[in-house]
Amino acid sequence: GVKVWAQRLSYVGELGFELYVDSSLAKDLYEILIEEGKNFELSHCGMHAMDIMRMESGFVHWGHDISPEENQYQAGLKFAISYKKNVNFIGKDALLKIKDQKLDKRMMMFTLKDSKPGEPLLLHEEPIYMDNKIIGRTTSGNYSFCYEKNLSFGYVNSGNTVETLKDKNIYIEIEKQKYPVEVLEKPLNNKDFKN
């Protein structure tokens, strides 16, 4: 037997578990899971599949969508902050200072209106335009085969909200060509992740 610490959480927006095991036993556990998983049609999943699944669910990625340059309020992660308990945590004082300040940028989700698999290739750092003015930059991009759409995350300047951008001409520039996008109000996969 292999002693495993299982956490019910998922980076991809589906019911899942992260398994923690002593590294010397990881190969044994992997082989057990693959063998037993045959009865449940278990299959391997690649990095790009995991990446688009987390994007479909609106999950941000450290290093792409959030970094030391952004804070939880800008990234739409206010729900993850609680000041109710008398508990100190790293960054609490900095967050309290900006808690009531106006955001200078905010994270949004976009889909290209004309989507083809992998075309254009969305990565990150593509400019986001309203008409001919740059209003932000993308942070992640990928093609969703489940929803048949190119999906992108990005930050837009202060004053822009889903409501204010909804009826505007919004574009993402990829390889010097502008592609019209739709601003999403909620993730494509908007399951209740609490159950």
Predicted ranges, named:
Residues G1-N195:
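Conserved, structured C-terminal
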